[in-house]
Amino acid sequence: IDADGPRRLRLLVAPDGSAELQVLEHRIHGDTPWAVPLDLEPVPSEHEFLFHKTTVREVYDNARHRFPDAPDVLLWNERGELTETTTGNLVVELDGELVTPPVLCGLLPGTQRAELLDTGEVVERVVRREDLARVDAAWMVNSVRGWVPIEVDSAARPAGVSSSGA
């Protein structure tokens, strides 16, 4: 592998058992919080592909296309419950606890999330959109990037919309 800087590996396995190894750029996030918009549309909490790590990423891709300049997008379901981001699980500090939404809200049960629950570092609790006003801190977590601090960017504009709303 001829690479400048950190890389991550992705192993894709097809239904016929064939495999492909991809080498991808690994962005280092640093300590600066990512400005993450709240998606415009809810995700269906029972969408079958939200619960499995797969290349079928339509729900995530659609959110990213709505906000192409954002490093990530915060998702929520039809009940107004926060779920995850397009690249990882959500952890928020709320009422003095580190909280992650339950899988039944419609999200991938990531390996980093599972470890945090197993060690008791986080607890599961429904986090509603209106709870964002009370959140003391928030992170996107996954096993590749670790804990990435995020802040909800209410000023973010979807693709094709200027800051004047035109």
Question: Each PLM stretch: what is its role?
Answer:
Residues 1-166:
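Helix-start/capping segments and mature chain N-termini
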